[in-house]
């Protein structure tokens, strides 16, 4: 909109980067052979690599969803539109962590907080966003 200094436009580039990182980290953890000596037949256990990759992918997905939710919320705000009735509570929770942009501010910090809130809700540590509890 004219006169608006704040925008979520550049989230698209960052979201693409997050999707690429998710793809890279989601590759299977392989077992590389130890090539230190001809008689050495030990292998490196891939569990730690898989664990780190799972943590990274989880965080990237939270960040990607936070960017998507913030951008959708901003689109509604810029158009002076209300979300569908079934999404109102969700959008209110998104805006609690990422208010609509109407000027300059640290959007990265807000996205980080929103991603943290998504992660907490998914793990059942929060009732936000109307997500069902995991069993």
Which residues fall in each region the model found?
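C-terminal auxiliary extensions adjacent to catalytic cores
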Residues: 1-135
């Amino acid at each position: 909109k004219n006169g608006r200094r704040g925008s979520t436009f550049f989230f698209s580039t960052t979201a693409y980067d997050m999707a690429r990182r998710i793809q890279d980290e989601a590759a299977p953890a392989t077992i590389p052979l130890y090539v230190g000596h001809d008689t050495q037949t030990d292998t490196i256990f891939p569990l730690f690599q898989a664990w780190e990759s799972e943590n990274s992918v989880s965080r990237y997905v939270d960040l990607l969803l936070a960017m998507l939710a913030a951008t959708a919320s901003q689109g509604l705000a810029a158009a002076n539109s209300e979300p569908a009735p079934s999404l109102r509570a969700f959008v209110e929770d998104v805006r609690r962590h990422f208010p609509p942009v109407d000027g300059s501010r640290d959007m990265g910090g807000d996205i980080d907080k929103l991603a943290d809130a998504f992660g907490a809700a998914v793990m059942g540590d929060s009732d936000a966003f109307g997500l069902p509890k995991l069993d």
